[in-house]
Structure formats: structure tokens, C-alpha cells
Regions:
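Nucleotide and nucleotide-moiety/phosphate-recognizing core
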Residues: 2-193, 200-207
């Protein structure tokens, strides 16, 4: 197994959801500071990886107009982000796949580097980002952000089997594997790094 570097990582933007809490719009095409969310995500990935591709299930020609390869889920029925990740592994040209959702406009510009450091240090085939959150007691604790993950291609069979058996929860699948943890809680890490927009109000709040 070759350690991840920018040359052997494919960036994968997950934009295939139904956005039910936003009235069913195609979330990746919604504007954030004048730019489509999925396009913003792709551009943030572009400097970190070898190539960027998109996962979308609607308006494919709109996504393709940006110049990136676009792939709909290989499983039917909107099976969730894991289905998008599986599609990424099935269409990955490199040894590693870096997944990000389209609706977190401030994810770190060193995401690939730091997750790569984590898998290299622990010799694992998966790394997951962790970020500070305030819990019900008012304490700040780091929690996993599993949609932000670095996956080795060898995970394709495991993920396919999990989905075929009816599994849909990301945490349940990642728990099947020893995965490296990378905390994004350094002084320069913004508290909004992994904030996502599930509603119009949240999207407006992120715009400031």
C-alpha cells in the first residue's frame, strides 16, 4: 500500500442527496456567495488532490458544465452518502479517495494532507476527520465527521457488501474497520470548518 500523496488521491464531492429539509432542491447547485456549493467544494479540493470528480443524481449536465467528471449513484433509490462513496471507489483513478459533502463550504484546505498523515502514521486504510463540537453539557469535545474521510480502494468490496445487506449508517460501516483519527482542533482551524447547511436558514447563517 502506497502512502497517500496529492498525486494518488482522487477528490470526490458528494452532491447526490435529496435535500428534503430544503424542499427537495438539488443542493449542490444552490448558490453560496455567488457560487454553486458543489463547485465551491470542487475548487477547494482541486489544490489538494490529483483529480476531482463529482457525485450527483440530478441535473448531471449542469454539473458536467464545470468540466469535472460526474457520476450518479451506482445503486438506485437514493441510498445515502455511502452509496455516493461506493460510486467514488468504483470510479477512482488513484489508490485513495477523499470524500467531502457539497454543503460544507469551509472545509479545511489541508484536509487531504492531514488525513493522509493520519493513515500513514497508523498504517490504516481509512481516516476520518474529527472536529470540536459543544455537547449538551456545554463542554467542547471532538466528534467524528465521517463524511470527510480518506478511503483506500481496497474498501470497495466491504462497502458494497454493507450496502447490499441494507446498511446505510456511515458510523456503522466505518466501525467495521480500524480507521485513523485526525483532530481538526489546532489554533488555525476555524470553528466553521465542518459546518454544513441542511436548511435554508443554515445556509444563510454560513454566508454571514
Amino acid at each position: 500500500m502506497v502512502a497517500p500523496t496529492p498525486d494518488n488521491i482522487t477528490g470526490w464531492v458528494l452532491a447526490g442527496g435529496q435535500a428534503q429539509r430544503m424542499g427537495g432542491v438539488d443542493k449542490g447547485l444552490q448558490l453560496f456567495q455567488g457560487q454553486a456549493l458543489a463547485l465551491r467544494a470542487a475548487k477547494r479540493l482541486q489544490t489538494q488532490v490529483h483529480i476531482v470528480k463529482l457525485n450527483a443524481n440530478r441535473h448531471l449536465s449542469d454539473y458536467a458544465s464545470w468540466g469535472y467528471d460526474v457520476h450518479p449513484d451506482s445503486l438506485s433509490g437514493y441510498a445515502g452518502p455511502l452509496a455516493g462513496m461506493l460510486t467514488g471507489l468504483q470510479n477512482c483513478d488513484t489508490e485513495w479517495l477523499l470524500c467531502v459533502p457539497c454543503d460544507s463550504p469551509f472545509f479545511p484546505l489541508d484536509l487531504a494532507y492531514r488525513l493522509g498523515m493520519a493513515v500513514d502514521a497508523e498504517q490504516s486504510i481509512m481516516a476520518v476527520a474529527w472536529a470540536p463540537e459543544v455537547n449538551a453539557q456545554g463542554d467542547t469535545v471532538c466528534r467524528p465527521q465521517p463524511v470527510f474521510c480518506l478511503l483506500h480502494l481496497s474498501l470497495q468490496t466491504s462497502l458494497s457488501d454493507f450496502l447490499q445487506s441494507g446498511g446505510r449508517k456511515i458510523d456503522a460501516w466505518t466501525a467495521q474497520h480500524a480507521n485513523a483519527r485526525m483532530d481538526f482542533n489546532l489554533p488555525h482551524d476555524t470553528h466553521q470548518a465542518f459546518a454544513n447547511a441542511n436548511t435554508w436558514q443554515e445556509l444563510k447563517g454560513l454566508e454571514g
